[in-house]
Design a protein with these regions (language model features):
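Extracytoplasmic/secreted proteins, especially bacterial periplasmic and envelope-associated proteins
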Residues: 59, 67, 71, 93, ...
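Conserved SGNH/GDSL esterase-like catalytic core that processes O-acyl groups on lipids
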Residues: 37-134
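Histidine-centered active-site loop/cap adjacent to the catalytic His
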Residues: 94, 210-255
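Substrate-gating cap/lid alpha-helix
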Residues: 160-200, 219
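Extracytoplasmic/secreted cell-surface and envelope-processing proteins
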Residues: 67-68, 117-125, 161-166, 206-212
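Sec-exported extracytoplasmic/periplasmic mature domains
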Residues: 77, 102, 113, 141-148, ...
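N-terminal secretory targeting modules
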Residues: 1-58, 236-255
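Active-site segments of SGNH/GDSL-like serine hydrolases
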Residues: 111-117, 142-176
């Protein structure tokens, strides 16, 4: 997720402002200089980041996202994708798979976290959270070391019993209690990293008819997850575009 950062440009601007304090000043009507310098084309933002323009993605899966890969490939038409992972994979094994594999694409789409260890009622939560955080950070480091420049991590489904198929309520009762714990840790990771953004499956999956059990996708759910991931990619790619040289209100047509 992109956040406010103190950039080198801002530091340079501050230093220049101090240096210019003693320069001669000339009064210019507000907007005159900007209008003279800006053309309509100058109001367009800069290009998308390289990771988005490359249109190559590595998809790291457990059984949930694995079921959505065909729909995701359809949604990402024009992208080259490779899938890594397996059902029931845990974070340490996912990191090992990345480190022992080949080059990772500039965009990594991560759909793991269902297979993690916790205790009910937040018992020993701090210790289990630290363990999860270490695993998640290690995985992101491995992805970066292998070539990823942007990570999109899919959150876990966090829905009530009322939207779960009746035959899968046992699964919901056995496992779904810790899915919010995982999402809490992923949101924390998102807050502290500029190279990671969340595809918020937990927010869009609170509905019926998208899974055949508590978590695994049916075709409708696979299509919804694919759209959710694509939306996260598009939003982050646009957010990372450099701002236009001139605000739209200062642009004037040139003959």
């Amino acid at each position: 997720m992109r956040r406010g950062r103190l950039t080198a440009a801002a530091l340079a601007a501050g230093a220049l402002g101090g240096a210019c304090a003693t320069w001669p000043m000339h009064a210019v009507p507000i907007g005159t200089a900007a209008a003279a310098e800006c053309a309509p084309r100058d109001t367009r933002p800069g290009p998308r980041p390289e990771w988005a323009r490359a249109k190559r993605a590595t998809i790291l899966v457990d059984s949930v996202l694995l079921g959505g890969v065909p729909a995701l490939r359809t949604e990402l038409r024009g992208w080259r994708t490779a899938t890594v992972g397996r059902p029931a994979i845990m974070l340490p094994a996912a990191e090992a798979a990345i480190r022992s594999g080949g080059r990772v694409a500039p965009l990594a789409i991560v759909g793991v976290g269902y297979n993690s260890l916790w205790e009910r009622g937040r018992r020993n939560y701090a210790g289990w959270a630290e363990r999860f955080d270490d695993g998640a950070r290690g995985l992101v480091r491995a992805l970066r070391a292998r070539g990823a420049r942007q990570v999109v991590w899919v959150t876990l489904r966090d829905a009530g019993r009322g939207v779960i198929p009746s035959g899968a309520l046992w699964q919901f009762d056995a496992y779904a209690w810790y899915f919010p714990y995982v999402n809490e840790r992923l949101r924390r990771l998102d807050r502290i990293r500029d190279d990671l953004v969340l595809a918020e499956w937990d927010r869009v999956s609170k509905r019926t008819g998208i899974t055949y059990d508590a978590i695994h996708l049916n075709p409708r759910g696979a299509a919804l997850m694919a759209r959710t991931i694509r939306a996260a990619i598009e939003a982050e790619a646009d957010a990372q575009r450099p701002p236009p040289p001139c605000p739209p209100e200062t642009a004037t047509a040139r003959s």
